[in-house]
Structures are given as C-alpha cells and as structure tokens.
Amino acid sequence: MITGIKGFNDILPGEVERWQHIEATARRVFSLYGFSEIRIPILEKTELFRRSIGDTTDIVEKEMYSFVDKGENAVTMRPEGTASVMRSYIEHKLYAQDPVAKLYYMGPMFRYERPQKGRYRQFHQIGAEVTGVTDPKVDAQVLTMLCHYFAELGLTEPTLQINSLGCPECRPAYRQALIDFLRERLDSLCEDCKRRYQTNPLRALDCKSAHCKEATASAPAMLDSLCAGCDDHFTATRRHLERAGTTYSINNRMVRGLDYYTRTTFELVTGLLGAQSAVAAGGRYDGLISDLGGPAIPGIGFAMGVERIALLLGDQHFVGRPDLFIAALGEEAQDEAFRLMCGLQRNGVAVEMDYEGKSLKSQMRRSDKFNARFTLIIGGDELAIGAAVLKAMDTGVQVEVPLTPEEVAARIT
C-alpha cells in the first residue's frame, strides 16, 4: 500500500466542509472591507524568498522546500504568501493606476518542519495585504477585519496582541542594544540564537527554548527605542483600534519570523492549541516592495493558519443535508427515480438515490445516513398513478405529490 507523505494530509469529506466554511467566511468578510482575491503560483524562484524573508530566518535556513529544476533554475515551493503577492503586484504593475490595492489569497504553503498538532509540512493559509497607505487607520482597519473574521466564525477566545518593530531609522540602535545584551548572556542561549545573535538578534526574543526565554526576560524593549515617527504611528494605531471597538493588548516582546516587518506587528493568540498559540499573525512591511525591485510603496498584511482555525472550531457540524433521497422499488421505479433526480438537480435541488435496487428498509436506512430532509418513495403503484409519497424526515409528515420535478421541488423548497 502506498501511503501519503508525512506532514502532507488529506482533507476528507466530513472535514472538508469545515474548511469550506472557513474559506467562505473569509471571502464574505473580506469583501465587506473592499478586498479582491488574487491567486498565486505554488512554485517561485528561490531568490524571491531569500530577498524577502531573509537569509538568517529559520524558514530560509532550515525549512524551505527548494530544488534545482531541469532547466537549472533554483525554485522553492512557497513557504508563505506575502512575498508572492508582492512579486505579482510588482511584475504586473498593479500600482500603475493606483498604488492602493487590497488583496487576499488562500492556499497551501510548504515548510520542512517536524509535524505536530497544528503544524504540518503542507499547511494552508488565508492572508490579506494592503499596499500604498502608511496611515495608521489602515493598520487599525486590517486588525479590525481580522478580529471581525474570527467573530463571524464564533471564535472569541483568540486575543489580539500588538507591538511595533520600529523603522530603519530607529531599529539599528535598538538592534545594537539587544546584541550587547545578548552578548553578556551567550552561555544561556540555544545554539541557534548563539550563532545568529549578531545577524538576527530579534529572533532570540521569539525563541521557544526555555533557556532563551529566561535569558531574555529582561531584554530591552523596542517600544522604548522608537523614533518620534514610529511612536506617533503606534499611538495613532492604538487610538483607531479603540475607536473601532477592537480589543487588544501590547506585547513588547513580539517579533516576527520574517525580516521584512516594520512598525506595527501583531498576532491573534490562543491558549487552546498548546505550543501553536498563534492562529494569525502579520504586520507592516513598508520596505518590502522596493526591496523586491518595485517602487517605494508601503504595505501591511497578515496570514492565518486554516488547520489551526479548524482545530478551534472543534466538533461543530458543517456537513450539509441533501434536500431529498429517492427510494425506488423495482427496475421501472429506478428508471423513473433517475429521471426525476436529474430534473430536480437541474432545478437546484440536492438529491441522492439508491442505485442498487435494495429493499425499502435498506433504502430508508440509507436516507437516514444521508440525513436527507425528505424521502420520496416510488414503487409500482406510484408509477401507475403518477404520484408518490413524500416524507418529511424531521416530522414524519407524509404527502402525495405528482412525479414531476416541478411539483416535487415546490413541496421541498
């Protein structure tokens, strides 16, 4: 037997309906805020992610599915969506008429990680990006939309945490202060943090190692080093969040695993998923578009993990009910049931039937399995008079209806 690859999961009927609900809710909510969908390729040039995410990040160093194709091109299965969206934005000059764009995407991402609850090698994200605006009202609106989305799913437990990572003007001084702080505590850091404490010191604040958490507990905070512009931006973002009625808390230790973030960063976190506490995360990336060869256009966005959202939805039932199950007794009745089913489906009615000519008792059990709203029973007598018994499965009420798609549809819709 050939089995699937570790960390690459099938989404089966019964579960896929939960995913469809997650995706449909995103489309509905995002459209309220003026977002349009963009579809991006799974395979990109490796250089895209090296330039955007950063050479010293865990993703680039350890986790990317990269290979050289038959044309000797270095390519990578996308580990995240923002870089691909920005590459498309630049390549197709979406900024030519208006630099402001509101885009969302959904689909699989790939990282070579140790599979565990809520973390897989093929995982799925829904993300949204806004380009062309630095106004903190946009930061607040993006965060408000994210919280609105989770509220629409009925998930109020994840809480919003925000921080500011400053800008190229104020971050270098903070970065040096953090390097000096870490240098005095190198013996307490994990090997990864020791190796890159000079090239990517902020990652030590986000390290999952208990030793690193303890060693950095008293580390300087970026919020204390913000320049006047970044401080004003963060203050205004918080003010607009409060005006929007969006609840948040400040987490001054929050950093992101991608190098392109500036100023506002955020996470939606929960205590219900163990170590995988973040279900959505993002931030502002005002230099990314120019770093990728485009104009100096700012941006902000987020991504959320579909698998983690599905876990939070728990045992909620999302499988739809067919409108009608047709139980047919005998070959002629089967033929009539098939004709009727096709006509009903063309009229927008969801219909199932039995194809094997089993007993009425067996077919009624099958109707129960499908959880159909109604069952139509057709036998020889029904064929003779051109009418059949329609049973409402929730109430048990039975009525006789003519055997035409229009008459049956009128009784059940």
Curated annotation (Swiss-Prot):
Molecular function per GO: ATP binding; histidine-tRNA ligase activity
Catalysed reactions listed for this entry: tRNA(His) + L-histidine + ATP = L-histidyl-tRNA(His) + AMP + diphosphate + H(+)
Keyword terms: Aminoacyl-tRNA synthetase, ATP-binding, Cytoplasm, Ligase, Nucleotide-binding, Protein biosynthesis
Pfam families per UniProt: HGTP_anticodon (PF03129), tRNA-synt_His (PF13393)
Annotated compartments: Cytoplasm
Any single GO CC term annotated in Swiss-Prot or TrEMBL for this entry: cytoplasm
E.C. no: 6.1.1.21
Main EC class the enzyme belongs to: ligase
Main location: cytoplasm
BP GO annotations: histidyl-tRNA aminoacylation
InterPro entries per the UniProt record, alphabetical: aa-tRNA-synth_II, aa-tRNA-synth_II/BPL/LPL, Anticodon-bd, Anticodon-bd_dom_sf, His-tRNA-ligase, HisRS-like_core, HisRS/HisZ, HisRS_anticodon
Family per record: Belongs to the class-II aminoacyl-tRNA synthetase family.
Subunit-level organization: Homodimer.
Stated name of the protein: Histidine--tRNA ligase
Species: Geobacter sulfurreducens (strain ATCC 51573 / DSM 12127 / PCA)
